[in-house]
Every structure is written in structure tokens, then in C-alpha cells.
């Protein structure tokens, strides 16, 4: 995926503000969406790139020198998130590694400010494979959001995937 496509998928979910924001990118990998997010945040913002693969994160370089990047090598599914209260959480092709999505989302909600949101980018599929062990289609995510207290979900983008299903982006907000 090109950086411009990643930016297009998430831009509607990032708050436009002049005030610095704090975000975490769970399952950051090599940083494509971390880089995309950095182009949308105001100066002085912080992004925590979180992934269990320290080597994958090794080459993450964000284009904006005015956004602070902090890399944390942990298993975001099982380890506690030790970040400051977040304005936003980005999960690009990461939620499909979580088997108990409801419990996980309830857990990460505790790291968010009350006005924060979760940006989710996933394959719109139900059938698992070795690379997508616990898939979550947008329809399933909609149903899951009903089980979260005071949550709303909105599909904000989609793009074709070279691996079968389309990729969607969704914004999960808490009222």
C-alpha cells in the first residue's frame, strides 16, 4: 500500500486541531500507518509506535520532525499499554490478531481520554487464514460496537486489497 492510500484511509478520523495530540499505533509493524498519521497531526504531537517486533519498527521514520515518535516493543494484545492518556488509537491490520475483541477494546478504552477515538483499518472478511487469524468484517465490527458501552462506529473509507477482500477504515467513538 502506498503512503497516500494510508493517509486517505485515516484522514477523516483524525481530529483537526492546532493543539498537540497523543496517539498510539498498535501493531505498528514497519510504520506505514504511523507515517500516515504523522502527516495529519499538528506540531508537538506524539505517536507511540507499538509492536512486538522491535526489528520491524527499527526503520520507522516519520516525515515530520515536529511530531515525536516513541517506539515501544511489547505484545499489545497481552502486555499492558503504558502510555499517557491518548487522544486516539490507531489499529491498522492489527485487530485481526486479537481473539477476544470485546475484552480487548474495553481494556484499551481505559487508556483513552473521554473524547478519544479508535481508528480501525481491517480486511472486510470473515474467513481466517494464517495471516489474518481472527478477521473482523465491518459488519461484525458494527455488531461488536453495540456491545461496547456508549460506543458508535462509522465507516470512513475503503480501498481494494491485492489479497482478496477490500480494506475498510472505521472510526470507533465513545459518547
Outline where the language-model segments fall.
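A short acidic, Gly/Pro-enriched loop at the edge of an enzyme's catalytic core
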Residues: 77-89
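A short glycine-rich, Lys/Arg-flanked "PGG" loop and its adjoining helix->strand segment in the class I
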Residues: 102-117
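Conserved alpha-helix/loop element of class I SAM-dependent methyltransferases that forms part
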Residues: 1-21, 36
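C-terminal alpha-helical "lid/dimerization" subdomain adjacent to the S-adenosyl-L-methionine
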Residues: 4, 39, 117-171
Amino acid at each position: 500500500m502506498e503512503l497516500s492510500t494510508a493517509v486517505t484511509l485515516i484522514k477523516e478520523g483524525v481530529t483537526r486541531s492546532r493543539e498537540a495530540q497523543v496517539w498510539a499505533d498498535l501493531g505498528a509493524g514497519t510504520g506505514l500507518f504511523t507515517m500516515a498519521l504523522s502527516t495529519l497531526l499538528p506540531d508537538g504531537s506524539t505517536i507511540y509506535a507499538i509492536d512486538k517486533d522491535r526489528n520491524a519498527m527499527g526503520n520507522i521514520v516519520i516525515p515530520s520532525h515536529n511530531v515525536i515518535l516513541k517506539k515501544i516493543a511489547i505484545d499489545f494484545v497481552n502486555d499492558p499499554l503504558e502510555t499517557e492518556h491518548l487522544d486516539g488509537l490507531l489499529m491498522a491490520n492489527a485487530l485481526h490478531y486479537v481473539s477476544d475483541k470485546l475484552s480487548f477494546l474495553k481494556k484499551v478504552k481505559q487508556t483513552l481520554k473521554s473524547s478519544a477515538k479508535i481508528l480501525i483499518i481491517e480486511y472486510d472478511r470473515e474467513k481466517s487464514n494464517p495471516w489474518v487469524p481472527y478477521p473482523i468484517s465491518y459488519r461484525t465490527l458494527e455488531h461488536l460496537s453495540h456491545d461496547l458501552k456508549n460506543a458508535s462506529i462509522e465507516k470512513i473509507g475503503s480501498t481494494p486489497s491485492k489479497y482478496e477482500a477490500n480494506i475498510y477504515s472505521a472510526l470507533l467513538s465513545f459518547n
